[in-house]
């Protein structure tokens, strides 16, 4: 960062970085939920690598207990549905909207040579008859995609799709974002600006080569959105301190990058980016407390509104080769969250709501991990053991506000 030190005052004036909203005391809390779109057939990349008809449901089906007290496999109550089917997606939309969720944040993958996992959103969500019951937005999952579906321990994690995109490709992506997503009537706007989140800010800066070039690239998307009739783009950064995926390297100074680049807000994807898992089944409430400590720190240091996260669970064992010895060897061979009961999840939701409302001028937004991270053990969709209990927890805390 020493090579690109600039006057922070000048940068903030140029990029117009977001400030905390005022007079939010009487606003309801917006509940967003991440959505991981790898549960549909017909993706060209998946079919080339895994075979026709492959989806991540195959890993869910094959999962097995790896240690005493380990609950696997998890069986979806609705069956192994295809999310690119508008009828299947309509069921998800109704369930989310009926239980207090306002928006899906789709994990969004776009590479130099085209999209990945896009048919869930393009053919399922946007073509569902009830699509307007939920807002939607995008988190650009701008990380390298490596072969971990499943991963055999000790082997090289093959790089399948590198994250880097050319300047020309980036401009094409910006046009696509504005035309096909940001201007949809149910795209999630904050103060008239399209919410757009970046998963890996370090990789984002590396892509453009410098802070100045990255900031200019962000402004190009803002200007395209304004030209299309919006008030701009609400740029959100996913902050994390502890890497999870093998391709992750946390930035040296997240707070500095937020200011230098002009992000409007910050958030987190999952508690595990901020909470250690010392035990095979680390207690859910301990992870919650560790995450809350990060939240308090982020509010003080980041200088922009921070949207907290509530994580339902963690168990990435379905992504591990079943023939390998189990241990805490590194993702996806990691320890898990235990005691993540619907009751403890509900308590975490209530505590998060209370902390949000305790700040009369703070943001009224949170996100949940996740709607359907089945192979990472964090999902609100019903399974055959707990039914709708996790969705009912969201409804009990937030449903009456809608």
What spans do the regions from the language model cover?
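Sec-dependent signal peptide recognition
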Residues: 2-9
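Bacterial Sec-dependent signal peptides at the C-terminal "C-region" and cleavage site
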Residues: 10-26
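Glycan-processing catalytic domains of CAZymes
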Residues: 23-402
